[in-house]
């Protein structure tokens, strides 16, 4: 697939999950460096907020906005996923008062980038994840998925959250 970064084409590899598909279990790294598996949240609905780096304005904004919304969602976990080191994620969450969303890192599992179809393969952000939102039910069935066409733009929060209403 192709998305853009400041209007320039960027190739994104892997299969991006579509509504009705099932996302297989994966393992990420929490802020305490412990493994965090998707299946750890088997009894909950999940919002996967995927982005290149928490140290960019748009990515930070998405974490803040989903954190605000997470407090209003019942039986739902918001996972904010990037390749940032857990130390950077923890620093950001502490400074910003992020308590309702959980930041997790792909730094020990780059295969996840392809598994979720967000592997940036070309351009200056190659090796990071493209911006996307995937909403899953308790059995990891995809309820909503958006691969954001322009990496510098925010996802459609309303569409993602509407499937959880």
UniProtKB/Swiss-Prot annotation:
Key word Disulfide bond present: yes
Segments forming domain Thioredoxin: 17-165
Keyword Secreted: no
EC number(s) per entry: 1.11.1.24
Source organism superkingdom: Bacteria
Keyword field: Antioxidant, Disulfide bond, Oxidoreductase, Peroxidase, Redox-active center
Cystine pairings recorded for this chain: 59-93, 59-93
GO molecular function, one term: thioredoxin peroxidase activity
Catalytic activity: a hydroperoxide + [thioredoxin]-dithiol = an alcohol + [thioredoxin]-disulfide + H2O
Enzyme class, broadest EC rank: oxidoreductase
Residues making up the signal peptide according to the UniProt record: none
Family, as annotated: Belongs to the peroxiredoxin family. Tpx subfamily.
Stored HAMAP family: Tpx
Subunit structure, as described in the record: Homodimer.
Additional detail: The active site is a conserved redox-active cysteine residue, the peroxidatic cysteine (C(P)), which makes the nucleophilic attack on the peroxide substrate. The peroxide oxidizes the C(P)-SH to cysteine sulfenic acid (C(P)-SOH), which then reacts with another cysteine residue, the resolving cysteine (C(R)), to form a disulfide bridge. The disulfide is subsequently reduced by an appropriate electron donor to complete the catalytic cycle. In this atypical 2-Cys peroxiredoxin, C(R) is present in the same subunit to form an intramolecular disulfide.
Purpose: Thiol-specific peroxidase that catalyzes the reduction of hydrogen peroxide and organic hydroperoxides to water and alcohols, respectively. Plays a role in cell protection against oxidative stress by detoxifying peroxides.
Official protein name in the record: Thiol peroxidase
Underlying gene: tpx
